[in-house]
């Protein structure tokens, strides 16, 4: 697993745990770093902070593209994988779209339900197709 793949997994861990606990993800990240339990890859912090900074817009897009699925009805893993994927698609200029989608698919395939990969791929694919109008 590449360093960036590990960073994505760790960012997902932070976002997922914070989502389930109802706590601020950046505060959880900062606390983990202060306690020496934080990520060793700076990209993890970049991902978590980026998702939190743009979460309102990301969630708006996810609500719009997830026809018939409210965010709170999605499995928490799927919701947070999608947040990571959308952040990389829209805000990480150094990450090719295909890599962002592929990495999101790898996470959701390993960690969520059998139906989740198709769901996540469909949403991220729609966002990629409409990306020029979303910027």
UniProtKB/Swiss-Prot annotation:
GO molecular function, one term: RNA binding
GO cellular component, one term: cytosol
Database matches in Pfam families: NusB
Superkingdom of origin organism: Bacteria
Keywords: RNA-binding, Transcription, Transcription antitermination, Transcription regulation
GO biological process, alphabetically ordered: DNA-templated transcription termination; transcription antitermination
Keyword Phosphoprotein: no
Its biological purpose: Involved in transcription antitermination. Required for transcription of ribosomal RNA (rRNA) genes. Binds specifically to the boxA antiterminator sequence of the ribosomal RNA (rrn) operons.
Similarity comment text for this entry: Belongs to the NusB family.
Protein name: Transcription antitermination protein NusB
